[in-house]
UniProtKB/Swiss-Prot annotation:
This is Probable tRNA sulfurtransferase. Belongs to the ThiI family. Catalyzes the ATP-dependent transfer of a sulfur to tRNA to produce 4-thiouridine in position 8 of tRNAs, which functions as a near-UV photosensor. Also catalyzes the transfer of sulfur to the sulfur carrier protein ThiS, forming ThiS-thiocarboxylate. This is a step in the synthesis of thiazole, in the thiamine biosynthesis pathway. The sulfur is donated as persulfide by IscS. ATP binds at residues 183-184, 208-209, 265, 287, 296. Pathway: Cofactor biosynthesis; thiamine diphosphate biosynthesis. HAMAP family: ThiI. It is found in: Cytoplasm. GO terms for biological process: thiamine biosynthetic process; thiamine diphosphate biosynthetic process; thiazole biosynthetic process; tRNA 4-thiouridine biosynthesis. GO terms for cellular component: cytosol. Residues 60-165 form the THUMP domain. InterPro entries: Rossmann-like_a/b/a_fold, ThiI_AANH, ThiI_fer, ThiI_N, THUMP_dom, THUMP_ThiI, tRNA_STrfase, tRNA_sulfurtransferase_ThiI. The keyword Cell inner membrane does not apply. Its EC number is 2.8.1.4.
Amino acid sequence: MQYSEIMVRHGELSTKGKNRMRFINKLKRNIQEVLSPFPNIKVRSDRDRTHVFLNGTPYEPVAEALKNVFGIQAFNPVYKLEKNVDLLIASVQEIMKDLYVDGMTFKISSKRSDHHFELDSRDLNLVLGNAVFDVLPNIKAQMKKPDVNLKVEIRDEAAYISHEEIKGAGGLPVGTSGKGMLMLSGGIDSPVAGYLALKRGVEIEAVHFASPPYTSPGALKKAQDLTRKLTKFGGNIQFIEVPFTEIQEEIKDKAPEAYLMTLTRRFMMRITDAIRASRSGLVIVNGESLGQVASQTLESMQAINAVTATPVIRPVVTMDKLEIIELAEKIDTFSISIQPFEDCCTIFAPDRPKTNPKLKNVEEYEKRFDIDGLVQRAVKGIKITEIKPEAEADDVDLMLDALL
């Protein structure tokens, strides 16, 4: 027998009261986007659960995709049948014969919401249990923690059988907590920060600074590939490429070397904040980890943060590098992040950056720049691409990647 659909149980949505259906509908849209590589799938939601109709699509890759979607507590692949006792008996026997191994224990758990059905839950348990013994006389029934708990649900529209429950990713549906701008460099930390923001329901748009010809097309593709990895947790993500060459050249020409990084990061923060304001964002998200590099000391963070009143979320700020790497490996971004393409944070990096920059000094150096003009030109020149989930790359894609 082939699974006909997957029943999805919602996560923290049960706590959301009057907003429950808004959360459920957002989760439905996220599931549809994540499963977009499977064109035959249909998704429908009600207050209790979301139904993913397979329509002939193989179950296994769909289940792998659903495991990552935030807002899902658990899901069950199910067989959908007509409400006919003889059909239920034959189906239960076939399922159990396929599952059976020596020494297996089982339990039938029936639930009837259609009270017009000819058998109540207790009688249905008895009839189906006896049917299993008829074809598997050596199997044993066990009420507590059986090897197989075969769940049979009689609803108004159909009968459903399931025996497997898969744990979901938990968290909140992406987009239910508002929108944030993720400052995505291409390193290890910022994709992990994006993942953690997504988990708490923040819809992210990835802001990436490019400085051609100093940064290569490979660096841009790397950032887009990282963004695509993040789409599996909640659907499509807008990728915003910011032209940053003019600003970096001005900073290099006009500022003391020790302050290059601080000034660069302040410009990045200004530009990200301007993009946020124009796109209805509420926060900025970045991958800063306290003390990891010179621009991530408390003094540096204070000097950089001073250009905006917008909240800046730093999900990995207290994590050790090894903890961040472990998460990067879990979400499958690590191997992309370590590809040897320089980003705009490294191309002009000074040998001895200032670890405790003084705000008054930074502001004095910035008088040498047309800050408003530089920021406006950068924002005006942004390119926006919608990054969507994709099926696994084929051999041709892998060969092309290897050539870059």
